[in-house]
Amino acid sequence: MLKEFKNFILRGNVLDLAVGVIIGAAFTALVKSLVDNLINPLIGMFVQSTALAHLSVTVGKTKFTYGAFLNDVINFIITAFVIFILIKFINKLFPKKEETVEEQKNEELETLQEIRDLLKKQ
């Protein structure tokens, strides 16, 4: 059982996933710092608040902190955009080689012609 576990852990996909999770966590902290320390103060200058996350509205005895939600939305948008750009960059570096439909048809046609020629010889 230990050998199976070792083989499972050392497979490329599992290691890639582990590295991705670790880098993702570090990147999330970086984006959070960017939003909290640079973007929020800029927005705060326009909404007369020290931090976007502290914006709230009180209805009755209930306090709705919509600023915290907006803060998380900004974090998500920045993270998603950077991941999108990263994936586009990686796809350009390592393009998938896909045969076009025309190439596939040409190969099929060549094979059929070879079969036809062999049948004619018989």
UniProtKB/Swiss-Prot annotation:
InterPro entries for the chain: Mechanosensitive_channel_CS, MS_channel, MSC/AndL, MscL_channel
Annotated keywords: Cell membrane, Ion channel, Ion transport, Membrane, Transmembrane, Transmembrane helix, Transport
The UniProt record lists the keyword DNA-binding: no
Transmembrane regions: 14-34, 67-87
One matching Pfam family: MscL
Record-level Gene Ontology MF annotations: mechanosensitive monoatomic ion channel activity
Gene3D superfamilies: Large-conductance mechanosensitive channel, MscL, domain 1
Ubl conjugation in keyword set: no
Primary localisation category: membrane
Membrane-protein topology: Multi-pass membrane protein
Cellular component terms (Gene Ontology): plasma membrane
Subcellular location as annotated: Cell membrane
Role description: Channel that opens in response to stretch forces in the membrane lipid bilayer. May participate in the regulation of osmotic pressure changes within the cell.
Subunit structure: Homopentamer.
Family indicated by similarity: Belongs to the MscL family.
Protein's UniProt name: Large-conductance mechanosensitive channel
